[in-house]
UniProtKB/Swiss-Prot annotation:
Chain's role: Polymerase that creates the 3'-poly(A) tail of mRNA's. May acquire specificity through interaction with a cleavage and polyadenylation factor.
Lipid biosynthesis listed as a keyword: no
EC number annotated for this UniProt entry: 2.7.7.19
Binding site for Mg(2+) 1: 99, 101
Misc. comment: The C.albicans mating-type-like (MTL) locus contains, in addition to the genes for the regulatory proteins (MTLA1, MTLA2, MTLALPHA1 and MTLALPHA2), a and alpha idiomorphs of a phosphatidylinositol kinase (PIKA and PIKALPHA), a poly(A) polymerase (PAPA and PAPALPHA) and an oxysterol binding protein-like protein (OBPA and OBPALPHA). PAPALPHA is not represented in the genomic sequence of strain SC5314 because that haploid assembly includes the mating type a allele of this locus.
GO biological process annotation, one example: RNA 3'-end processing
Keyword terms of this UniProt record: ATP-binding, Magnesium, Manganese, Metal-binding, mRNA processing, Nucleotide-binding, Nucleus, RNA-binding, Transferase
Reaction equations catalysed: RNA(n) + ATP = RNA(n)-3'-adenine ribonucleotide + diphosphate
Gene behind this protein: PAPALPHA
Binding site for ATP: 86-88, 99-101, 153, 214, 223, 232-233
Stretches with biased composition (Low complexity): 547-558
Name of the protein: Poly(A) polymerase PAPalpha
GO molecular function: ATP binding; metal ion binding; poly(A) RNA polymerase activity; RNA binding
Length: 558
Protein backbone atom coordinates (compact mmCIF):
# COMPACT_ATOMS: atom_id res chain seq x y z
CA UNK A 1 0.00 0.00 0.00
CA UNK A 2 1.27 3.45 -0.94
CA UNK A 3 1.71 5.68 2.14
CA UNK A 4 3.79 8.43 0.53
CA UNK A 5 2.32 11.94 0.48
CA UNK A 6 1.82 13.41 -2.98
CA UNK A 7 0.90 17.00 -3.70
CA UNK A 8 0.38 19.97 -1.40
CA UNK A 9 -1.81 18.23 1.22
CA UNK A 10 -2.12 14.91 2.98
CA UNK A 11 -4.25 12.32 1.15
CA UNK A 12 -7.95 12.17 1.97
CA UNK A 13 -7.84 8.37 2.09
CA UNK A 14 -5.15 5.73 1.67
CA UNK A 15 -7.66 2.87 1.56
CA UNK A 16 -7.43 0.31 -1.21
CA UNK A 17 -10.33 -0.52 -3.53
CA UNK A 18 -13.49 -2.28 -2.40
CA UNK A 19 -14.75 -5.34 -4.31
CA UNK A 20 -17.49 -3.20 -5.84
CA UNK A 21 -14.97 -0.59 -7.01
CA UNK A 22 -12.92 -3.35 -8.66
CA UNK A 23 -16.02 -4.57 -10.51
CA UNK A 24 -16.82 -1.02 -11.66
CA UNK A 25 -13.19 -0.59 -12.71
CA UNK A 26 -13.31 -3.70 -14.91
CA UNK A 27 -16.54 -2.40 -16.45
CA UNK A 28 -14.90 0.99 -17.10
CA UNK A 29 -11.90 -0.54 -18.89
CA UNK A 30 -14.25 -2.66 -21.01
CA UNK A 31 -16.36 0.38 -21.92
CA UNK A 32 -13.23 2.28 -22.96
CA UNK A 33 -12.19 -0.66 -25.14
CA UNK A 34 -15.67 -0.90 -26.66
CA UNK A 35 -15.48 2.77 -27.59
CA UNK A 36 -12.10 2.39 -29.30
CA UNK A 37 -10.17 4.39 -26.73
CA UNK A 38 -7.03 2.26 -27.11
CA UNK A 39 -4.93 2.28 -30.27
CA UNK A 40 -3.63 -0.86 -31.98
CA UNK A 41 0.02 -1.85 -31.67
CA UNK A 42 0.48 -1.38 -35.42
CA UNK A 43 -0.89 2.18 -35.34
CA UNK A 44 1.36 3.05 -32.40
CA UNK A 45 4.37 1.69 -34.31
CA UNK A 46 3.50 4.00 -37.20
CA UNK A 47 3.50 7.01 -34.85
CA UNK A 48 7.00 6.09 -33.69
CA UNK A 49 8.18 5.85 -37.31
CA UNK A 50 6.72 9.27 -38.16
CA UNK A 51 8.38 10.86 -35.12
CA UNK A 52 11.70 9.28 -36.12
CA UNK A 53 11.31 10.85 -39.56
CA UNK A 54 10.56 14.24 -38.01
CA UNK A 55 13.72 14.02 -35.93
CA UNK A 56 15.66 13.74 -39.20
CA UNK A 57 13.68 16.62 -40.75
CA UNK A 58 14.41 18.85 -37.74
CA UNK A 59 18.13 18.16 -38.03
CA UNK A 60 17.95 18.95 -41.75
CA UNK A 61 16.10 22.18 -40.90
CA UNK A 62 18.69 23.33 -38.34
CA UNK A 63 21.53 22.37 -40.69
CA UNK A 64 19.98 24.35 -43.57
CA UNK A 65 19.49 27.48 -41.45
CA UNK A 66 22.98 27.16 -39.97
CA UNK A 67 24.58 26.98 -43.42
CA UNK A 68 22.57 30.01 -44.55
CA UNK A 69 24.17 31.92 -41.67
CA UNK A 70 27.69 31.12 -42.89
CA UNK A 71 28.50 28.35 -40.44
CA UNK A 72 31.01 25.71 -41.44
CA UNK A 73 29.70 22.31 -42.43
CA UNK A 74 30.87 20.69 -39.18
CA UNK A 75 29.35 23.45 -37.02
CA UNK A 76 26.08 23.23 -38.93
CA UNK A 77 25.99 19.46 -38.37
CA UNK A 78 26.76 19.89 -34.66
CA UNK A 79 23.99 22.49 -34.22
CA UNK A 80 21.61 19.55 -33.90
CA UNK A 81 17.93 20.07 -33.10
CA UNK A 82 15.63 17.71 -31.26
CA UNK A 83 11.99 16.59 -31.27
CA UNK A 84 10.10 16.21 -27.99
CA UNK A 85 6.49 15.18 -27.50
CA UNK A 86 3.97 16.36 -24.93
CA UNK A 87 0.24 16.14 -24.28
CA UNK A 88 -1.76 12.91 -24.65
CA UNK A 89 0.94 11.10 -26.64
CA UNK A 90 3.65 11.65 -24.04
CA UNK A 91 1.18 10.89 -21.23
CA UNK A 92 0.32 7.59 -22.90
CA UNK A 93 -3.42 8.27 -23.18
CA UNK A 94 -3.71 8.71 -26.93
CA UNK A 95 -6.20 6.80 -29.03
CA UNK A 96 -7.08 6.29 -32.70
CA UNK A 97 -7.14 9.65 -34.45
CA UNK A 98 -5.37 11.50 -31.63
CA UNK A 99 -2.89 14.11 -32.74
CA UNK A 100 0.75 14.13 -31.67
CA UNK A 101 1.74 17.30 -29.83
CA UNK A 102 5.31 17.84 -30.92
CA UNK A 103 7.93 20.33 -29.75
CA UNK A 104 10.85 21.25 -32.00
CA UNK A 105 13.81 22.52 -29.95
CA UNK A 106 16.44 24.51 -31.84
CA UNK A 107 19.64 26.44 -30.98
CA UNK A 108 19.76 30.20 -30.56
CA UNK A 109 20.60 31.13 -34.16
CA UNK A 110 17.40 29.54 -35.53
CA UNK A 111 14.39 31.87 -35.39
CA UNK A 112 10.64 31.44 -35.32
CA UNK A 113 10.52 32.97 -38.81
CA UNK A 114 12.84 30.17 -39.96
CA UNK A 115 10.42 27.67 -38.43
CA UNK A 116 7.47 29.00 -40.44
CA UNK A 117 9.44 29.39 -43.67
CA UNK A 118 12.40 27.00 -43.97
CA UNK A 119 10.99 24.13 -41.90
CA UNK A 120 7.50 24.47 -43.37
CA UNK A 121 9.02 24.28 -46.87
CA UNK A 122 10.97 21.13 -45.96
CA UNK A 123 7.72 19.53 -44.78
CA UNK A 124 5.86 20.63 -47.95
CA UNK A 125 8.31 18.64 -50.06
CA UNK A 126 7.46 15.40 -48.28
CA UNK A 127 5.16 13.01 -50.20
CA UNK A 128 3.47 11.99 -46.91
CA UNK A 129 2.11 15.51 -46.37
CA UNK A 130 -1.68 15.76 -46.75
CA UNK A 131 -2.47 19.13 -45.15
CA UNK A 132 -0.49 21.95 -43.59
CA UNK A 133 -1.60 25.13 -41.83
CA UNK A 134 0.78 27.66 -40.32
CA UNK A 135 -0.68 29.84 -37.54
CA UNK A 136 2.15 32.18 -36.48
CA UNK A 137 -0.26 34.60 -34.74
CA UNK A 138 -1.59 32.03 -32.24
CA UNK A 139 -0.93 32.37 -28.48
CA UNK A 140 1.51 29.51 -29.00
CA UNK A 141 2.59 29.76 -32.68
CA UNK A 142 1.89 26.45 -34.37
CA UNK A 143 2.10 24.43 -37.59
CA UNK A 144 -0.80 21.97 -37.92
CA UNK A 145 -0.26 18.94 -40.14
CA UNK A 146 -1.97 15.89 -41.53
CA UNK A 147 1.02 13.70 -42.28
CA UNK A 148 0.78 10.09 -43.46
CA UNK A 149 -2.64 9.76 -41.85
CA UNK A 150 -1.58 11.27 -38.51
CA UNK A 151 -2.48 14.71 -37.14
CA UNK A 152 0.58 16.53 -35.81
CA UNK A 153 0.73 19.86 -33.99
CA UNK A 154 4.22 21.35 -34.24
CA UNK A 155 5.46 24.12 -31.98
CA UNK A 156 8.98 25.48 -31.63
CA UNK A 157 11.23 26.66 -28.82
CA UNK A 158 14.58 28.36 -29.30
CA UNK A 159 17.08 27.82 -26.49
CA UNK A 160 19.87 30.26 -25.72
CA UNK A 161 22.55 27.67 -26.48
CA UNK A 162 24.66 27.16 -29.65
CA UNK A 163 23.79 23.48 -30.16
CA UNK A 164 20.95 21.08 -29.28
CA UNK A 165 22.35 17.52 -28.99
CA UNK A 166 20.18 14.39 -29.12
CA UNK A 167 20.84 13.64 -25.44
CA UNK A 168 19.48 17.02 -24.31
CA UNK A 169 16.81 16.94 -21.61
CA UNK A 170 14.64 19.86 -20.55
CA UNK A 171 14.95 19.36 -16.77
CA UNK A 172 17.56 22.06 -16.20
CA UNK A 173 15.92 25.38 -15.27
CA UNK A 174 18.95 27.25 -16.56
CA UNK A 175 17.84 26.36 -20.09
CA UNK A 176 15.01 28.85 -19.57
CA UNK A 177 17.37 31.81 -19.28
CA UNK A 178 16.89 34.69 -21.74
CA UNK A 179 13.87 33.15 -23.47
CA UNK A 180 10.81 35.10 -24.58
CA UNK A 181 7.32 34.19 -23.32
CA UNK A 182 6.41 32.25 -26.46
CA UNK A 183 9.45 30.02 -26.10
CA UNK A 184 8.69 29.50 -22.41
CA UNK A 185 5.09 28.53 -23.18
CA UNK A 186 6.28 26.10 -25.85
CA UNK A 187 8.82 24.43 -23.55
CA UNK A 188 6.31 24.20 -20.73
CA UNK A 189 4.24 21.54 -22.54
CA UNK A 190 6.91 18.84 -22.42
CA UNK A 191 8.22 19.82 -18.98
CA UNK A 192 4.71 19.79 -17.49
CA UNK A 193 3.81 16.42 -19.01
CA UNK A 194 6.96 14.83 -17.58
CA UNK A 195 6.31 16.26 -14.11
CA UNK A 196 2.68 15.08 -14.06
CA UNK A 197 3.81 11.48 -14.56
CA UNK A 198 6.29 11.86 -11.69
CA UNK A 199 3.67 13.35 -9.34
CA UNK A 200 1.01 10.62 -9.49
CA UNK A 201 1.15 7.56 -7.19
CA UNK A 202 0.14 4.93 -9.76
CA UNK A 203 0.64 5.93 -13.41
CA UNK A 204 -1.56 3.13 -14.80
CA UNK A 205 -4.49 4.12 -12.56
CA UNK A 206 -3.98 7.74 -13.57
CA UNK A 207 -3.90 6.91 -17.28
CA UNK A 208 -7.11 4.86 -17.23
CA UNK A 209 -8.92 7.52 -15.19
CA UNK A 210 -7.66 10.21 -17.56
CA UNK A 211 -8.85 8.25 -20.60
CA UNK A 212 -12.29 8.19 -19.00
CA UNK A 213 -12.34 11.92 -18.24
CA UNK A 214 -11.00 12.78 -21.71
CA UNK A 215 -13.70 10.72 -23.39
CA UNK A 216 -16.36 12.28 -21.15
CA UNK A 217 -15.10 15.82 -21.83
CA UNK A 218 -15.01 15.22 -25.59
CA UNK A 219 -18.48 13.65 -25.63
CA UNK A 220 -19.89 16.53 -23.59
CA UNK A 221 -18.06 19.15 -25.74
CA UNK A 222 -16.09 20.69 -22.86
CA UNK A 223 -12.64 19.83 -24.24
CA UNK A 224 -10.63 22.51 -26.01
CA UNK A 225 -8.38 25.21 -24.60
CA UNK A 226 -8.70 27.45 -27.65
CA UNK A 227 -12.48 27.67 -27.16
CA UNK A 228 -12.33 28.48 -23.44
CA UNK A 229 -12.51 24.97 -21.98
CA UNK A 230 -9.78 22.91 -20.31
CA UNK A 231 -7.43 21.28 -22.81
CA UNK A 232 -5.79 17.89 -22.51
CA UNK A 233 -3.05 18.98 -20.09
CA UNK A 234 -5.50 20.79 -17.80
CA UNK A 235 -7.82 17.76 -17.59
CA UNK A 236 -4.73 15.62 -16.91
CA UNK A 237 -3.68 17.81 -13.98
CA UNK A 238 -7.22 17.78 -12.57
CA UNK A 239 -7.22 13.97 -12.65
CA UNK A 240 -3.68 13.81 -11.25
CA UNK A 241 -4.71 15.84 -8.20
CA UNK A 242 -7.46 13.33 -7.37
CA UNK A 243 -4.93 10.50 -7.73
CA UNK A 244 -2.75 12.28 -5.16
CA UNK A 245 -5.67 12.53 -2.73
CA UNK A 246 -6.56 8.82 -3.12
CA UNK A 247 -3.16 7.16 -3.77
CA UNK A 248 -4.38 3.55 -3.52
CA UNK A 249 -7.69 3.88 -5.36
CA UNK A 250 -8.54 2.22 -8.67
CA UNK A 251 -9.49 4.26 -11.74
CA UNK A 252 -13.26 3.91 -11.28
CA UNK A 253 -13.01 5.37 -7.77
CA UNK A 254 -10.76 8.19 -9.01
CA UNK A 255 -13.41 9.13 -11.59
CA UNK A 256 -16.18 9.11 -8.97
CA UNK A 257 -14.11 11.30 -6.61
CA UNK A 258 -13.19 13.57 -9.53
CA UNK A 259 -16.78 14.61 -10.11
CA UNK A 260 -17.62 14.76 -6.43
CA UNK A 261 -14.67 16.98 -5.49
CA UNK A 262 -14.67 19.39 -8.44
CA UNK A 263 -18.43 19.92 -8.22
CA UNK A 264 -17.82 21.24 -4.69
CA UNK A 265 -14.45 22.92 -5.33
CA UNK A 266 -14.15 26.46 -4.00
CA UNK A 267 -13.18 28.19 -7.26
CA UNK A 268 -11.05 30.24 -7.85
CA UNK A 269 -8.99 28.28 -5.32
CA UNK A 270 -6.19 26.91 -7.53
CA UNK A 271 -5.59 23.23 -8.23
CA UNK A 272 -1.92 22.50 -7.51
CA UNK A 273 0.06 19.29 -7.94
CA UNK A 274 2.96 20.70 -5.92
CA UNK A 275 3.98 23.96 -4.29
CA UNK A 276 4.76 26.77 -6.70
CA UNK A 277 8.53 27.07 -7.09
CA UNK A 278 10.53 30.26 -7.12
CA UNK A 279 13.58 30.40 -9.31
CA UNK A 280 16.61 32.50 -10.16
CA UNK A 281 15.31 33.54 -13.57
CA UNK A 282 13.59 36.78 -14.46
CA UNK A 283 10.45 35.02 -15.61
CA UNK A 284 6.88 35.49 -14.51
CA UNK A 285 5.42 32.82 -12.21
CA UNK A 286 1.66 32.55 -11.58
CA UNK A 287 0.91 34.70 -8.53
CA UNK A 288 -2.54 36.27 -8.04
CA UNK A 289 -1.27 38.33 -5.11
CA UNK A 290 1.30 39.98 -7.32
CA UNK A 291 -0.36 40.07 -10.74
CA UNK A 292 -3.91 41.47 -11.12
CA UNK A 293 -4.37 39.52 -14.36
CA UNK A 294 -3.83 36.23 -12.51
CA UNK A 295 -6.64 37.16 -10.11
CA UNK A 296 -9.04 37.08 -13.07
CA UNK A 297 -8.55 33.35 -13.65
CA UNK A 298 -11.85 31.65 -12.83
CA UNK A 299 -10.82 28.01 -12.49
CA UNK A 300 -7.03 28.07 -12.13
CA UNK A 301 -5.17 24.81 -12.71
CA UNK A 302 -1.48 25.49 -12.21
CA UNK A 303 1.30 23.71 -14.06
CA UNK A 304 3.88 22.01 -11.81
CA UNK A 305 6.96 22.79 -13.91
CA UNK A 306 8.85 26.03 -13.29
CA UNK A 307 7.80 28.68 -14.20
CA UNK A 308 4.28 27.77 -13.03
CA UNK A 309 1.51 29.01 -15.32
CA UNK A 310 -2.26 28.78 -15.37
CA UNK A 311 -3.32 26.12 -17.89
CA UNK A 312 -6.94 27.30 -17.77
CA UNK A 313 -6.54 31.05 -18.30
CA UNK A 314 -8.88 30.84 -21.31
CA UNK A 315 -11.95 29.88 -19.26
CA UNK A 316 -14.64 32.56 -19.46
CA UNK A 317 -17.74 33.26 -17.39
CA UNK A 318 -19.86 31.31 -19.89
CA UNK A 319 -17.59 28.31 -20.29
CA UNK A 320 -17.20 28.09 -16.51
CA UNK A 321 -20.99 27.81 -16.14
CA UNK A 322 -21.05 25.09 -18.80
CA UNK A 323 -18.17 23.16 -17.16
CA UNK A 324 -19.76 23.32 -13.70
CA UNK A 325 -23.10 22.12 -15.09
CA UNK A 326 -21.37 19.16 -16.76
CA UNK A 327 -19.43 18.31 -13.60
CA UNK A 328 -22.71 18.34 -11.67
CA UNK A 329 -24.33 16.05 -14.25
CA UNK A 330 -21.32 13.73 -14.06
CA UNK A 331 -21.50 13.61 -10.28
CA UNK A 332 -25.18 12.65 -10.36
CA UNK A 333 -24.59 9.91 -12.94
CA UNK A 334 -21.64 8.51 -10.96
CA UNK A 335 -23.88 8.15 -7.91
CA UNK A 336 -26.33 6.15 -10.02
CA UNK A 337 -23.54 4.04 -11.53
CA UNK A 338 -22.35 3.25 -8.02
CA UNK A 339 -25.93 2.33 -7.05
CA UNK A 340 -26.26 0.06 -10.08
CA UNK A 341 -28.95 2.19 -11.71
CA UNK A 342 -26.83 3.41 -14.64
CA UNK A 343 -23.78 2.26 -16.58
CA UNK A 344 -20.60 3.92 -17.83
CA UNK A 345 -22.21 4.46 -21.24
CA UNK A 346 -24.64 6.91 -19.60
CA UNK A 347 -21.72 9.06 -18.48
CA UNK A 348 -20.45 9.22 -22.07
CA UNK A 349 -23.77 10.17 -23.66
CA UNK A 350 -23.33 12.77 -26.41
CA UNK A 351 -23.84 16.47 -25.66
CA UNK A 352 -27.04 18.34 -26.57
CA UNK A 353 -25.43 21.59 -27.79
CA UNK A 354 -27.47 21.79 -31.00
CA UNK A 355 -30.73 21.26 -29.12
CA UNK A 356 -29.99 23.40 -26.09
CA UNK A 357 -30.40 27.03 -27.18
CA UNK A 358 -33.08 28.96 -29.05
CA UNK A 359 -30.52 31.22 -30.70
CA UNK A 360 -27.04 30.70 -32.11
CA UNK A 361 -24.39 32.81 -33.76
CA UNK A 362 -22.72 31.24 -36.77
CA UNK A 363 -19.25 32.61 -37.54
CA UNK A 364 -18.18 31.87 -41.11
CA UNK A 365 -14.57 32.09 -42.28
CA UNK A 366 -14.25 31.81 -46.06
CA UNK A 367 -11.42 32.01 -48.57
CA UNK A 368 -11.03 32.03 -52.33
CA UNK A 369 -7.56 30.61 -51.94
CA UNK A 370 -5.54 27.44 -51.50
CA UNK A 371 -6.39 24.89 -48.84
CA UNK A 372 -3.29 25.86 -46.88
CA UNK A 373 -4.08 29.58 -46.95
CA UNK A 374 -7.68 28.91 -45.92
CA UNK A 375 -6.52 26.82 -42.98
CA UNK A 376 -4.30 29.70 -41.96
CA UNK A 377 -7.25 32.13 -42.15
CA UNK A 378 -9.79 29.86 -40.44
CA UNK A 379 -7.19 28.93 -37.83
CA UNK A 380 -6.72 32.59 -37.03
CA UNK A 381 -10.49 33.09 -36.71
CA UNK A 382 -10.68 30.06 -34.42
CA UNK A 383 -7.87 31.41 -32.24
CA UNK A 384 -9.77 34.70 -31.79
CA UNK A 385 -13.26 33.24 -31.30
CA UNK A 386 -12.87 33.39 -27.54
CA UNK A 387 -12.49 37.18 -27.86
CA UNK A 388 -15.97 37.32 -29.39
CA UNK A 389 -17.33 35.18 -26.55
CA UNK A 390 -15.83 37.58 -23.98
CA UNK A 391 -17.43 40.56 -25.72
CA UNK A 392 -20.82 38.84 -25.99
CA UNK A 393 -20.80 37.90 -22.30
CA UNK A 394 -20.90 41.54 -21.24
CA UNK A 395 -23.69 42.47 -23.68
CA UNK A 396 -26.94 43.24 -21.91
CA UNK A 397 -29.32 40.29 -21.98
CA UNK A 398 -26.67 37.61 -22.66
CA UNK A 399 -26.54 35.08 -19.83
CA UNK A 400 -24.25 32.59 -21.59
CA UNK A 401 -22.28 32.70 -24.85
CA UNK A 402 -21.37 29.03 -25.28
CA UNK A 403 -18.84 28.21 -28.06
CA UNK A 404 -18.99 24.81 -29.70
CA UNK A 405 -15.60 23.08 -29.70
CA UNK A 406 -15.50 21.84 -33.31
CA UNK A 407 -15.78 23.46 -36.70
CA UNK A 408 -17.60 22.39 -39.87
CA UNK A 409 -16.01 22.85 -43.29
CA UNK A 410 -17.01 22.65 -46.95
CA UNK A 411 -15.48 23.52 -50.31
CA UNK A 412 -17.50 24.56 -53.36
CA UNK A 413 -16.55 25.27 -56.95
CA UNK A 414 -17.43 28.89 -57.64
CA UNK A 415 -18.32 28.61 -61.34
CA UNK A 416 -20.32 31.76 -62.11
CA UNK A 417 -21.72 32.10 -58.58
CA UNK A 418 -21.17 35.11 -56.35
CA UNK A 419 -19.00 34.39 -53.31
CA UNK A 420 -21.18 36.49 -51.01
CA UNK A 421 -24.31 34.57 -52.03
CA UNK A 422 -22.59 31.35 -51.01
CA UNK A 423 -21.39 32.81 -47.71
CA UNK A 424 -24.86 34.22 -46.97
CA UNK A 425 -26.39 30.78 -47.51
CA UNK A 426 -23.79 28.84 -45.56
CA UNK A 427 -24.64 27.74 -42.02
CA UNK A 428 -28.46 27.82 -42.19
CA UNK A 429 -31.15 25.33 -43.17
CA UNK A 430 -32.81 27.81 -45.54
CA UNK A 431 -29.53 28.29 -47.41
CA UNK A 432 -29.08 24.60 -48.17
CA UNK A 433 -31.35 24.63 -51.25
CA UNK A 434 -29.02 27.17 -52.89
CA UNK A 435 -25.89 25.32 -51.77
CA UNK A 436 -27.21 22.11 -53.36
CA UNK A 437 -27.09 23.84 -56.75
CA UNK A 438 -23.31 24.18 -56.38
CA UNK A 439 -20.65 21.63 -57.18
CA UNK A 440 -19.02 20.64 -53.92
CA UNK A 441 -15.39 19.63 -53.83
CA UNK A 442 -14.33 16.95 -51.38
CA UNK A 443 -10.70 17.35 -52.32
CA UNK A 444 -8.41 19.77 -50.51
CA UNK A 445 -5.97 19.55 -53.40
CA UNK A 446 -5.43 22.76 -55.30
CA UNK A 447 -5.84 22.80 -59.05
CA UNK A 448 -5.93 25.50 -61.66
CA UNK A 449 -9.00 24.15 -63.44
CA UNK A 450 -11.59 25.24 -60.89
CA UNK A 451 -11.85 28.32 -58.73
CA UNK A 452 -12.94 27.23 -55.27
CA UNK A 453 -14.40 28.87 -52.21
CA UNK A 454 -13.52 27.20 -48.92
CA UNK A 455 -15.73 27.76 -45.89
CA UNK A 456 -15.41 26.94 -42.20
CA UNK A 457 -18.11 27.71 -39.66
CA UNK A 458 -18.20 27.91 -35.88
CA UNK A 459 -21.24 28.11 -33.61
CA UNK A 460 -21.89 29.97 -30.38
CA UNK A 461 -25.06 29.12 -28.43
CA UNK A 462 -26.76 32.07 -26.74
CA UNK A 463 -28.73 31.82 -23.50
CA UNK A 464 -30.66 35.09 -23.30
CA UNK A 465 -32.55 36.93 -20.60
CA UNK A 466 -34.11 39.89 -22.34
CA UNK A 467 -36.25 42.60 -20.84
CA UNK A 468 -39.02 44.27 -22.79
CA UNK A 469 -38.51 47.75 -24.16
CA UNK A 470 -41.23 50.39 -24.00
CA UNK A 471 -42.85 49.08 -27.21
CA UNK A 472 -43.17 45.56 -25.79
CA UNK A 473 -40.48 44.07 -28.03
CA UNK A 474 -37.61 42.07 -26.58
CA UNK A 475 -34.36 43.30 -28.11
CA UNK A 476 -30.75 42.28 -28.11
CA UNK A 477 -28.06 44.49 -29.56
CA UNK A 478 -24.79 42.72 -30.26
CA UNK A 479 -23.70 44.99 -33.09
CA UNK A 480 -20.83 46.40 -31.04
CA UNK A 481 -19.13 43.14 -29.96
CA UNK A 482 -19.49 41.75 -33.49
CA UNK A 483 -18.10 44.92 -35.07
CA UNK A 484 -15.12 44.76 -32.71
CA UNK A 485 -14.54 41.13 -33.67
CA UNK A 486 -14.61 42.08 -37.36
CA UNK A 487 -11.95 44.71 -36.70
CA UNK A 488 -9.69 42.18 -34.97
CA UNK A 489 -10.05 39.68 -37.83
CA UNK A 490 -9.62 42.16 -40.65
CA UNK A 491 -6.62 43.70 -38.91
CA UNK A 492 -4.76 40.41 -39.11
CA UNK A 493 -1.88 39.84 -41.52
CA UNK A 494 -3.83 36.72 -42.57
CA UNK A 495 -6.62 38.87 -44.07
CA UNK A 496 -6.60 39.90 -47.74
CA UNK A 497 -9.52 41.92 -49.11
CA UNK A 498 -11.48 40.02 -51.74
CA UNK A 499 -9.75 36.75 -50.85
CA UNK A 500 -10.68 36.23 -47.20
CA UNK A 501 -14.15 36.74 -45.75
CA UNK A 502 -15.66 36.80 -42.27
CA UNK A 503 -19.37 36.80 -41.48
CA UNK A 504 -21.42 36.51 -38.30
CA UNK A 505 -25.06 35.57 -38.64
CA UNK A 506 -27.93 34.80 -36.28
CA UNK A 507 -29.43 31.34 -36.58
CA UNK A 508 -32.49 30.11 -34.70
CA UNK A 509 -32.54 26.56 -33.36
CA UNK A 510 -34.87 25.24 -36.06
CA UNK A 511 -32.76 26.99 -38.75
CA UNK A 512 -29.51 25.18 -37.93
CA UNK A 513 -28.03 23.44 -40.96
CA UNK A 514 -28.35 19.66 -41.30
CA UNK A 515 -24.64 18.92 -41.04
CA UNK A 516 -24.52 19.72 -37.31
CA UNK A 517 -26.62 16.60 -36.68
CA UNK A 518 -25.29 13.08 -37.09
CA UNK A 519 -27.10 10.42 -39.09
CA UNK A 520 -30.05 9.18 -37.07
CA UNK A 521 -30.32 12.28 -34.92
CA UNK A 522 -33.69 13.97 -35.06
CA UNK A 523 -33.79 17.68 -35.87
CA UNK A 524 -35.48 19.99 -33.36
CA UNK A 525 -39.01 20.87 -34.45
CA UNK A 526 -40.15 24.41 -35.06
CA UNK A 527 -42.74 25.51 -32.53
CA UNK A 528 -46.22 25.75 -34.05
CA UNK A 529 -47.25 28.43 -31.59
CA UNK A 530 -48.35 31.65 -33.31
CA UNK A 531 -47.17 34.93 -31.93
CA UNK A 532 -49.42 37.83 -31.27
CA UNK A 533 -49.04 40.80 -33.61
CA UNK A 534 -49.45 44.41 -32.60
CA UNK A 535 -50.00 47.45 -34.83
CA UNK A 536 -47.57 50.28 -34.24
CA UNK A 537 -48.30 53.96 -34.84
CA UNK A 538 -46.36 53.82 -38.11
CA UNK A 539 -48.82 51.20 -39.35
CA UNK A 540 -46.25 48.41 -39.43
CA UNK A 541 -47.05 45.00 -38.01
CA UNK A 542 -44.59 43.64 -35.50
CA UNK A 543 -44.45 40.46 -33.53
CA UNK A 544 -44.75 40.89 -29.79
CA UNK A 545 -41.85 39.23 -27.98
CA UNK A 546 -39.94 39.40 -31.24
CA UNK A 547 -36.99 37.08 -31.61
CA UNK A 548 -33.90 38.83 -30.30
CA UNK A 549 -31.97 37.63 -33.30
CA UNK A 550 -33.90 39.96 -35.57
CA UNK A 551 -32.44 43.02 -33.95
CA UNK A 552 -28.98 41.53 -33.55
CA UNK A 553 -28.14 40.64 -37.12
CA UNK A 554 -24.59 41.55 -38.01
CA UNK A 555 -23.66 40.33 -41.46
CA UNK A 556 -20.53 41.43 -43.20
CA UNK A 557 -18.44 39.38 -45.51
CA UNK A 558 -15.58 41.40 -46.76
Amino acid sequence: MNTKTYGVTEPISTNGPTPKENILNDALIQELKNRGSFESEQATKKRVEVLTLFQRLVQEFVYTVSKSKNMSDSMAQDAGGKVFTFGSYRLGVYGPGSDIDTLVVVPKHVTRDDFFSVFADIIRKRPELEEIACVPDAYVPIIKLEFDGISIDLIMARLNIPRVPLDLTLDDKNLLKNLDEKDLRSLNGTRVTDEILQLVPKPTVFKHALRCIKLWAQQRAVYGNIFGFPGGVAWAMLVARICQLYPNAVSSAIVEKFFNIYTKWNWPEPVLLKSIEDGPLQVRVWNPRLYPHDRLHRMPVITPAYPSMCATHNITSSTQKVILAELSRGSSIMQEIHAGKKTWSDLFEKHSFFYKYKFYLCVVAASIDSAEEHKKWSGFIESKLRQLVLKLEVAEGVEIAHPYVKDFSNTFILDDKNAEDIINSYGTLSGEDFLRTLHSSDSDKDDEEFKKIRLTKYYIGLDLNLTKSSDGVRKLDIQYPCAEFYSICKGSTSFTEGVNFIQIKNVKLHELSNDVYEDGEERPKKSGKKRKKVIKEDGQKRVRNESPASSASVNGSS
